[in-house]
Protein backbone atom coordinates (compact mmCIF):
# COMPACT_ATOMS: atom_id res chain seq x y z
CA UNK A 1 0.00 0.00 0.00
CA UNK A 2 2.81 2.36 0.82
CA UNK A 3 4.49 1.58 -2.51
CA UNK A 4 1.30 2.35 -4.39
CA UNK A 5 0.85 5.64 -2.60
CA UNK A 6 4.44 6.76 -3.27
CA UNK A 7 3.91 7.65 -6.91
CA UNK A 8 0.92 9.77 -6.02
CA UNK A 9 2.84 11.67 -3.42
CA UNK A 10 5.68 12.15 -5.87
CA UNK A 11 3.36 13.55 -8.53
CA UNK A 12 1.92 15.95 -6.01
CA UNK A 13 5.36 17.20 -5.11
CA UNK A 14 6.25 17.72 -8.78
CA UNK A 15 3.03 19.59 -9.41
CA UNK A 16 3.63 21.84 -6.41
CA UNK A 17 7.19 22.53 -7.65
CA UNK A 18 5.82 23.68 -11.01
CA UNK A 19 7.34 20.91 -13.16
CA UNK A 20 5.86 20.85 -16.67
CA UNK A 21 3.69 17.91 -17.60
CA UNK A 22 5.09 15.31 -19.96
CA UNK A 23 4.49 15.99 -23.63
CA UNK A 24 3.40 12.62 -24.82
CA UNK A 25 5.84 9.74 -24.94
CA UNK A 26 8.77 11.95 -26.16
CA UNK A 27 9.36 13.82 -22.90
CA UNK A 28 8.99 17.44 -21.78
CA UNK A 29 10.34 20.60 -23.45
CA UNK A 30 13.22 22.41 -21.81
CA UNK A 31 12.22 25.60 -20.07
CA UNK A 32 13.67 28.85 -21.40
CA UNK A 33 15.71 30.93 -19.02
CA UNK A 34 17.70 34.12 -19.71
CA UNK A 35 20.43 33.08 -17.28
CA UNK A 36 21.25 29.39 -17.62
CA UNK A 37 23.59 28.37 -14.84
CA UNK A 38 23.39 31.90 -13.46
CA UNK A 39 25.19 33.44 -16.51
CA UNK A 40 23.60 35.86 -18.98
CA UNK A 41 24.42 34.83 -22.57
CA UNK A 42 23.12 38.04 -24.18
CA UNK A 43 22.40 41.55 -22.99
CA UNK A 44 18.67 42.14 -22.52
CA UNK A 45 19.28 45.87 -23.13
CA UNK A 46 20.68 45.30 -26.60
CA UNK A 47 18.26 42.53 -27.58
CA UNK A 48 15.01 44.09 -26.38
CA UNK A 49 15.48 47.83 -26.95
CA UNK A 50 13.56 49.37 -29.85
CA UNK A 51 16.45 51.64 -30.85
CA UNK A 52 18.83 54.21 -29.43
CA UNK A 53 18.40 57.70 -30.93
CA UNK A 54 22.05 58.44 -30.15
CA UNK A 55 23.14 55.70 -32.58
CA UNK A 56 21.22 57.39 -35.42
CA UNK A 57 22.89 60.72 -34.65
CA UNK A 58 26.33 59.08 -34.62
CA UNK A 59 25.57 57.35 -37.92
CA UNK A 60 24.49 60.62 -39.51
CA UNK A 61 27.62 62.35 -38.24
CA UNK A 62 29.78 59.57 -39.64
CA UNK A 63 28.12 59.83 -43.06
CA UNK A 64 28.52 63.61 -43.05
CA UNK A 65 32.17 63.30 -42.05
CA UNK A 66 32.77 60.78 -44.83
CA UNK A 67 31.17 63.16 -47.34
CA UNK A 68 33.43 65.97 -46.16
CA UNK A 69 36.55 63.83 -46.48
CA UNK A 70 35.56 62.62 -49.95
CA UNK A 71 34.87 66.20 -51.04
CA UNK A 72 38.22 67.36 -49.65
CA UNK A 73 40.10 64.53 -51.39
CA UNK A 74 38.35 65.24 -54.68
CA UNK A 75 39.14 68.95 -54.33
CA UNK A 76 42.83 68.23 -53.74
CA UNK A 77 43.03 65.94 -56.76
CA UNK A 78 41.19 68.44 -58.96
CA UNK A 79 43.56 71.18 -57.79
CA UNK A 80 46.56 69.12 -58.88
CA UNK A 81 44.92 68.41 -62.24
CA UNK A 82 44.11 72.11 -62.68
CA UNK A 83 47.75 73.02 -62.01
CA UNK A 84 48.89 70.41 -64.52
CA UNK A 85 46.44 71.75 -67.10
CA UNK A 86 47.71 75.28 -66.51
CA UNK A 87 51.30 74.10 -66.94
CA UNK A 88 50.39 72.26 -70.15
CA UNK A 89 48.61 75.36 -71.44
CA UNK A 90 51.73 77.44 -70.82
CA UNK A 91 53.86 74.85 -72.60
CA UNK A 92 51.44 74.76 -75.52
CA UNK A 93 51.50 78.56 -75.75
CA UNK A 94 55.30 78.57 -75.79
CA UNK A 95 55.37 75.85 -78.46
CA UNK A 96 53.05 77.91 -80.66
CA UNK A 97 55.08 81.07 -80.11
CA UNK A 98 58.34 79.28 -80.94
CA UNK A 99 56.79 77.70 -84.03
CA UNK A 100 55.55 81.10 -85.22
CA UNK A 101 58.98 82.65 -84.61
CA UNK A 102 60.81 79.81 -86.40
CA UNK A 103 58.51 80.05 -89.40
CA UNK A 104 59.11 83.79 -89.67
CA UNK A 105 62.88 83.36 -89.39
CA UNK A 106 62.90 80.76 -92.16
CA UNK A 107 61.22 83.31 -94.42
CA UNK A 108 63.81 85.99 -93.71
CA UNK A 109 65.88 86.96 -96.75
CA UNK A 110 69.25 85.21 -96.96
CA UNK A 111 71.74 84.91 -99.82
CA UNK A 112 73.45 81.81 -98.45
CA UNK A 113 72.30 78.26 -97.79
CA UNK A 114 71.63 77.96 -94.09
CA UNK A 115 73.22 74.94 -92.40
CA UNK A 116 72.23 73.48 -89.03
CA UNK A 117 74.71 74.16 -86.25
CA UNK A 118 75.66 77.64 -87.47
CA UNK A 119 74.78 80.99 -85.93
CA UNK A 120 73.14 83.62 -88.12
CA UNK A 121 72.77 87.32 -87.40
CA UNK A 122 69.57 89.16 -88.16
CA UNK A 123 69.71 92.72 -89.51
CA UNK A 124 67.15 95.23 -90.71
CA UNK A 125 67.61 97.66 -93.59
CA UNK A 126 66.24 101.18 -93.77
CA UNK A 127 63.58 99.88 -96.13
CA UNK A 128 62.31 97.54 -93.41
CA UNK A 129 63.62 94.36 -95.01
CA UNK A 130 65.12 91.84 -92.62
CA UNK A 131 67.95 89.54 -93.67
CA UNK A 132 70.36 87.00 -92.25
CA UNK A 133 74.13 87.34 -92.37
CA UNK A 134 77.03 85.27 -91.11
CA UNK A 135 78.88 88.45 -90.07
CA UNK A 136 78.37 89.42 -86.44
CA UNK A 137 78.07 93.02 -85.21
CA UNK A 138 81.43 92.58 -83.49
CA UNK A 139 83.02 91.75 -86.83
CA UNK A 140 81.34 94.77 -88.42
CA UNK A 141 82.55 97.04 -85.67
CA UNK A 142 81.51 100.66 -85.99
CA UNK A 143 80.88 100.23 -89.71
CA UNK A 144 77.78 98.03 -89.24
CA UNK A 145 75.51 99.20 -92.07
CA UNK A 146 72.14 98.17 -90.64
CA UNK A 147 70.32 97.71 -87.36
CA UNK A 148 71.13 94.50 -85.55
CA UNK A 149 68.01 92.63 -84.34
CA UNK A 150 69.47 89.46 -82.85
CA UNK A 151 71.39 86.25 -83.39
CA UNK A 152 69.99 82.73 -83.74
CA UNK A 153 71.43 79.25 -84.01
CA UNK A 154 69.86 76.87 -86.50
CA UNK A 155 69.36 73.51 -84.81
CA UNK A 156 69.41 70.15 -86.57
CA UNK A 157 65.63 69.92 -86.31
CA UNK A 158 65.51 73.26 -88.21
CA UNK A 159 64.31 75.14 -85.16
CA UNK A 160 65.93 78.40 -84.10
CA UNK A 161 67.49 79.10 -80.71
CA UNK A 162 68.08 82.69 -79.59
CA UNK A 163 71.71 83.52 -78.91
CA UNK A 164 71.18 83.97 -75.17
CA UNK A 165 69.67 80.46 -74.92
CA UNK A 166 72.24 78.63 -77.04
CA UNK A 167 74.40 77.44 -74.14
CA UNK A 168 71.44 76.10 -72.17
CA UNK A 169 69.90 74.43 -75.22
CA UNK A 170 73.20 72.83 -76.20
CA UNK A 171 73.54 71.41 -72.68
CA UNK A 172 70.07 69.85 -72.93
CA UNK A 173 70.81 68.35 -76.33
CA UNK A 174 74.15 66.99 -75.11
CA UNK A 175 72.48 65.36 -72.12
CA UNK A 176 69.83 63.75 -74.33
CA UNK A 177 72.49 62.48 -76.73
CA UNK A 178 74.39 60.95 -73.81
CA UNK A 179 71.29 59.17 -72.53
CA UNK A 180 70.40 57.86 -75.98
CA UNK A 181 73.93 56.63 -76.66
CA UNK A 182 74.14 54.65 -73.43
CA UNK A 183 73.22 50.98 -73.88
CA UNK A 184 71.09 49.40 -71.20
CA UNK A 185 73.18 46.57 -69.74
CA UNK A 186 71.22 43.69 -68.27
CA UNK A 187 72.54 42.07 -65.08
CA UNK A 188 74.46 38.81 -65.70
CA UNK A 189 72.19 36.87 -63.35
CA UNK A 190 68.43 37.17 -63.11
CA UNK A 191 68.22 35.31 -59.80
CA UNK A 192 67.88 37.26 -56.54
CA UNK A 193 71.21 38.55 -55.30
CA UNK A 194 71.60 38.65 -51.53
CA UNK A 195 75.26 39.61 -51.59
CA UNK A 196 76.05 41.98 -48.75
CA UNK A 197 72.86 41.09 -46.87
CA UNK A 198 74.16 37.88 -45.28
CA UNK A 199 76.97 37.50 -42.77
From Swiss-Prot:
Keywords: Coiled coil. The keyword Ribosomal protein does not apply. InterPro entries: DUF2452. Residues 1-30 are annotated as: Disordered. Residues 71-101 form a coiled coil. It holds the Pfam family DUF2452. One of its GO terms (molecular function) is identical protein binding. It comes from the Eukaryota. This is Uncharacterized protein C1orf50. The gene is C1orf50.
Amino acid sequence: MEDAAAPGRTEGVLERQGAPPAAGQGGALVELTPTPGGLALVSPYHTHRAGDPLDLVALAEQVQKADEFIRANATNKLTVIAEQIQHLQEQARKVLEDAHRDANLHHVACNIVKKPGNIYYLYKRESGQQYFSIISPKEWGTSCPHDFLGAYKLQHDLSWTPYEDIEKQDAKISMMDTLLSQSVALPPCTEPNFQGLTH
